[in-house]
Amino acid sequence: MAIDYSLGASIMLQLGPFQFGVTTAAYQSLRRSSEYRWPAQERFNNHAALQYVGPGTESITLSGVVYPEWRGGIHVIDDLRDLASQGLPQLMIDGRGNLLGRWVIERVEEAQSVFADAGVPRKQEFTLQLRRYHGDEDVA
């Protein structure tokens, strides 16, 4: 994977070495989901009691469009696939510099349309499914 992006460019989000932005892959939608675990504890002759046992799964879904002839190039979504295939959690930082923790790429979806010569797509829509990674060192 040869990711070479310019410094000083407007970055929306960075996942490991990959920078989301107008010059690479701009996402139009970011959906974040946070779960909290409340298992039911059965009680005799009474309603079940809920007990908070801690945070659950966090996930992010990014959806966007790449126009390879305009910005980013035809390789951008393949760069995301290469990053996912490394099998390593990636550090995520938002465009304001906030550290969002380590995340793994669970799925990369791509839809190609508006084709040029040799079947090269002029439009690539993508959806990226991420899940927050918590290693053993994160357990308190």
PLM features per residue range, with description:
Residues 1-140:
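Compositionally biased, intrinsically disordered low-complexity segments enriched in polar/Pro/Gly
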